[in-house]
C-alpha cells in the first residue's frame, strides 16, 4: 500500500477526473466542487467484480440519506469511465450496477489512489479505502479494508452524523454513538455527567 498524502486533520488531496454521473453522462469533477458539503469518497478495486457491486449499490441506494446530511458520496476505481458506464448499463441480475445515484470516478493513471494511499502497487488496483471529508475539505476519517471484505453503509452514515454533531455542538461522541444518544462534554468535571449515567 502506498503512503500517500491523505492525513487526518489535513486538507484532503484534491483531484480532477472524469466520472460517470447519475444521469449516465461523463463529466470532469474535482473534490473542490463539493466544498461546503461533507464527502464520503470510497475506492474499490475493479469494475465487474464480486464484492464491489454490493458496496456500490448499497451506497447508491442510500445516497438520499447522505444528501439529507449535506453529504455527497463518490466512488472511484482505476477503471476507465467507459468501463464504469458499461458496468452501470449492465443489469444487476447479470452482475452489473444498474442506474446509479452517485458519481463513479475514473482513475486509470492511479494518481488519485496513490495520493490517498490506497494503491496496491503490485496489482495496480485500489484497496477498499473510505475517506470522510468535512465541509471545509478536511479529512476526518480513514478506513482501508483488504480486498475480500466490503464496508458498512450504516457505519459510514453513523460516522458522518457523529462528526457533524461534534462540529456543531463541540461535544464528543462515545463508542457506538447514534443520533439521540448521550454525548460527552470534553471537560474533566463536565464529562462526569455522562460517566455518572453508565452502569
From Swiss-Prot:
Entry-annotated residues carrying N-acetylserine: 2
Posttranslational mods: Phosphorylated on Thr-90 during the M-phase, which leads to a more than 80% decrease in enzymatic activity. Acetylation increases reducing activity and resistance to superoxidation. Deacetylated by HDAC6 which decreases reducing activity.
Sequence positions bearing Phosphoserine: 32
Residue numbers of N6-succinyllysine PTMs: 35
InterPro entries for this protein: AhpC/TSA (IPR000866), Peroxiredoxin (IPR050217), Peroxiredoxin_AhpC-typ (IPR024706), Peroxiredoxin_C (IPR019479), Thioredoxin-like_sf (IPR036249), Thioredoxin_domain (IPR013766)
Up-regulation conditions: Constitutively expressed in most human cells; is induced to higher levels upon serum stimulation in untransformed and transformed cells.
Cross-link Glycyl lysine isopeptide (Lys-Gly) (interchain with G-Cter in SUMO1): where in chain: 185
Gene3D superfamilies referenced in this protein's UniProt entry, alphabetically: Glutaredoxin (3.40.30.10)
Domain Thioredoxin positions: 6-165
Reaction catalysed by this enzyme: a hydroperoxide + [thioredoxin]-dithiol = an alcohol + [thioredoxin]-disulfide + H2O
CDD domains referenced in this protein's UniProt entry, alphabetically: PRX_Typ2cys
Keywords: Acetylation, Antioxidant, Cytoplasm, Disulfide bond, Isopeptide bond, Oxidoreductase, Peroxidase, Phosphoprotein, Redox-active center, Ubl conjugation
Effect listed in the UniProt record for changing residue 197 to Q/R: Reduces acetylation
Region feature Disordered, mapped onto this chain: 176-199
Residue(s) of cross-link: Glycyl lysine isopeptide (Lys-Gly) (interchain with G-Cter in SUMO2): 7, 120
Transmembrane residue ranges: none
Record field: compositional bias (Basic and acidic residues): 184-199
Lineage: superkingdom: Eukaryota
One Gene Ontology term from the biological process aspect of the record: regulation of stress-activated MAPK cascade
EC number(s) from the headed UniProt entry: 1.11.1.24
Catalytic residues, chain numbering: 52 (cysteine sulfenic acid (-soh) intermediate)
Subunit structure: Homodimer; disulfide-linked, upon oxidation. 5 homodimers assemble to form a ring-like decamer. Interacts with GDPD5; forms a mixed-disulfide with GDPD5. Interacts with SESN1 and SESN2. Interacts with FAM107A.
Function, in words: Thiol-specific peroxidase that catalyzes the reduction of hydrogen peroxide and organic hydroperoxides to water and alcohols, respectively. Plays a role in cell protection against oxidative stress by detoxifying peroxides and as sensor of hydrogen peroxide-mediated signaling events. Might participate in the signaling cascades of growth factors and tumor necrosis factor-alpha by regulating the intracellular concentrations of H(2)O(2). Reduces an intramolecular disulfide bond in GDPD5 that gates the ability to GDPD5 to drive postmitotic motor neuron differentiation.
Similarity annotation: Belongs to the peroxiredoxin family. AhpC/Prx1 subfamily.
Name of the molecule in the record: Peroxiredoxin-1
Organism name: Homo sapiens
